[in-house]
Amino acid sequence: MAFRCQRDSYAREFTTTVVSCRPAELHTEESNGKKEVLSGFQVVLEDTLLFPEGGGQPDDRGTINDISVLRVTRRGTQADHFTQTPLTPGTEVQVRVDWERRFDHMQQHSGQHLITAVADDLFGLKTTSWELGRLRSVIELDSPTVTAEQVAAIERSVNEKIRDRLPVNVRELSLDDPEVEQVRGRGLPDDHAGPIRVVTIESVDSNMCCGTHVSNLSDLQVIKILGTEKGKKNKTNLIFLAGNRVLKWMERSHGIEKALTALLKCGAEDHVEAVKKLQNSSKLLQKNNLNLLRDLAVHIAHSLRNSPDWGGVITLHRKGGGEASWRSWAACNFPAPFAAWSQVCALCFRKDGDSEFMNIIANEIGSEETLLFLTVGDEKGAGLFLLAGPAEAVETLGPRVSEVLEGKGAGKKGRFQGKATKMSRRAEVQALLQDYISTQSAEE
């Protein structure tokens, strides 16, 4: 038996009766990947206006007596409606469909049928699957390549048929009807029961389908094929929009074009060239900046070596463009194995820099005999850190430094580096290093 939504895709509300209501759970996944389990009820109605997911088409949204329906799934000849409020069996209820979502799905699904038929008719390109996405839809074609000329020809043809206002009819055929063998289709579900539903675009295509469709191609308004992408092995994905999605896409594209025109100070026809020039300038600036940072790293390393406090524990604190300020901790005479160290040095902070910047400093100073704690990034936020020095000390201190800075890192061969989220706790790391040295001295 076809549901009301399949018999009349344009119906927006109707009255029916609750058959059953049982406790259930709904597993959801947000766009950010977060998963959630909702407690609620599966409600079965005598008939439904809400389409259950199937045939590549997502399910409808809507309400039952103003209670939101969060999911609709098919179970044999019945449709389960998930709600978070129970409904009493035998109660007469009013069902309303989210018409914007429904009509969008009708446009995309009928658009897919049309593109599939035309691609096959013009070039023998067979559709193997399709997906009705939230923003765009994808048709998988059984061909390793589809040329730009073929795409343009398909787009011209489908829009001509839309302008011809071709009717779209829905019929039901029995399983033993000879016509079943002549219609396009990818098989029936294992639990299918009853007649076969066939959607026909007059003079274009007949296709087995359970989905909701427009009654005339004119309701598609327009189809825009955005292009193709490489699909699975020997397959090509054709990306398209139909109907209102094309209008939204044009509105969004025009808004972006206006914004770029204002930012780039040129007309739309010059946007690409203007961006290329900006990219080239940016690459040159990045290259120059990298060279300057490398030179600065060498300069800082030499400045440390030449510091009057060399032999004690010193720090360099620099917030970016300002002058560096040096502070001496306390000169220490380190016993073996630390007596071989010429310095225990903490280069506390520089806002600008990267991992390479810190490693150049470590290489120039020579971390085999010097314990270095280097950081770059936001003084009170996130950044990068490097602990370098004798392997035994770094192996012991590295994970503890990472923990204090609430970061993640790894180390080998006398270097431990990583990302930190709490650069404001650098002073605690300095204290940790001092305590470690003091403890080693006491043990000696």
From Swiss-Prot:
Its main location: cytoplasm. SUPFAM superfamilies: ThrRS/AlaRS common domain, Translation proteins. The modification Phosphoserine is found at S174. Binds 1 zinc ion per subunit. Pfam families: tRNA_SAD (PF07973). It comes from the Eukaryota. The keyword Aminoacyl-tRNA synthetase does not apply. One of its GO terms (biological process) is regulation of translational fidelity. The keyword Cell division does not apply. One of its GO terms (molecular function) is Ser-tRNA(Ala) deacylase activity. It is found in: Cytoplasm. Zn(2+) binds at H109, H113, C209, H213. Its cofactor is Zn(2+). Belongs to the class-II aminoacyl-tRNA synthetase family. Alax-L subfamily. Functions in trans to edit the amino acid moiety from incorrectly charged tRNA(Ala). This is Alanyl-tRNA editing protein Aarsd1. It comes from Bos taurus (Bovine).
